Amino acid sequence: REEFEAISAPNFDERGQVGSEYLKIFKELWTNENPSFSGEYESFDNIFFAPKPVQKPHPPIWVGGESAPALKRAASLGDCWYPIGSNPRFPLDNRDRLQARISRLQGFAEEFGRDPNEIDLAYSASWFETSPNQKREKWFIGSPDEVTEDITQIKELGVNHLVLSFPGTSTSEILDKMSY
C-alpha cells in the first residue's frame, strides 16, 4: 500500500482492475497507428506512440496470479498464465491443485470466447527440500529422480515454461541447494 501511495498510484485495492486496464492500454498503444483509449483510470486520444513492437501483434503478455480475478485477467487479456506455486492462499504445489487452477483458467477463457489452448502456461517454484526424510506432499521435495518426476508432471499438464528460483542469501548457498 505504501508504494502505491508514494507514487500517487490508484488505490491499492483496485490494483487488479488497474492492471487489467493497463494491459488494454498497452495493446492499444502497440497495435494501432492512432491509439485512443477511454477507461476508468486512464484516457487518451490523438497521440503518437513509437516505436511499435517487432513482435506482432505485440510481445506476449504473461499474467501472474492465482486468484479468480487474476485467472480472469489471464483468460481475457493474457497470452500466458504465470502462477507462483508457493502462494500460501492458493498453493499450486502438486498435480491436483495445479490441474484444478488450469481447468478454471480454461473455463474462464471459454467464457470470454477464447480458445483455452491459445493461452500458454508457465509455472514458478521457489521451494526445494532435498532431505531424504521429508514427506512428499508437494512437488520439489525429495531426490533428483523425484524432482524429475515432478517436472514431468508439470509438463504433462501443458506447462511450457518452468522458472525455478532457489532461495538463499549468497551464490554459494544457492549453488549448494541446486547441487543436491
Where are these predicted regions, by residue range?
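Active-site-adjacent structural elements that line small-molecule/cofactor binding pockets in enzymes
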Residues: 1-180
